[in-house]
């Protein structure tokens, strides 16, 4: 859904990454003009996407899944750490391909403004009983879930001793150690 949101706003992503094995994932790209946008499809992601994707497709093989590791080794491909989410997978891909700069936009890893996802995509979070609090980029306490906090900590471990790549965290989501908080509009025009 986020790919469609970006394209409707005139923002052309460098790539679209799909990691989810659910059969309905084709809905993420159905009807979108993707002819010039590469798709990175995790080897265990839903192949239904391929019926609707018009651009170039690259398969990403993941570490920790024996079949994927074997195929990657057999064909001489890289294998990537997935960390459990599309964001963590995308980060590892960017880092393994030596990205100089990674800018997290929309990677809140918390329920910023009480919402589960970007405006118009997710749902309102009203029950905070099972949630935990973390510090946001603006210095305030915000709620997050156990899973989102695991992803945040995974990212922090992955970038802890990183050299050659600068990671920026935009928005008012959870603060990520090692990723300075910046306003996303500071990067417009780059």
Residue locations for each model-derived region?
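Metal-ion/cofactor- or nucleotide/acyl-coenzyme-handling active-site neighborhoods
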Residues: 2-190
């Amino acid at each position: 859904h986020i790919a469609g949101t970006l394209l409707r706003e005139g923002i052309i992503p460098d790539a679209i990454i799909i990691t989810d094995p659910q059969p309905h994932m084709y809905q993420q790209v159905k009807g979108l003009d993707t002819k010039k946008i590469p798709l990175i499809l995790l080897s265990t992601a839903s192949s239904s996407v391929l019926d609707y994707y018009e651009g170039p497709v690259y398969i990403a093989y993941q570490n920790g899944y024996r079949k994927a590791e074997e195929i990657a080794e057999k064909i001489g491909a890289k294998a990537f750490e997935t960390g459990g989410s599309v964001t963590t997978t995308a980060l590892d891909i960017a880092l393994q391909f030596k990205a100089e700069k990674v800018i997290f936009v929309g990677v809140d890893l918390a329920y910023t403004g009480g919402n589960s996802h970007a405006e118009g995509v997710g749902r309102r979070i009203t029950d905070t009983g099972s949630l935990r609090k973390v510090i946001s980029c603006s210095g305030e306490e915000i709620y997050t879930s156990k899973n989102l906090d695991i992803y945040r900590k995974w990212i922090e471990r992955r970038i802890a001793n990183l050299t050659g790549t600068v990671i920026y965290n935009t928005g008012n989501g959870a603060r990520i150690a090692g990723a300075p908080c910046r306003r996303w509009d500071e990067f417009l025009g780059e």
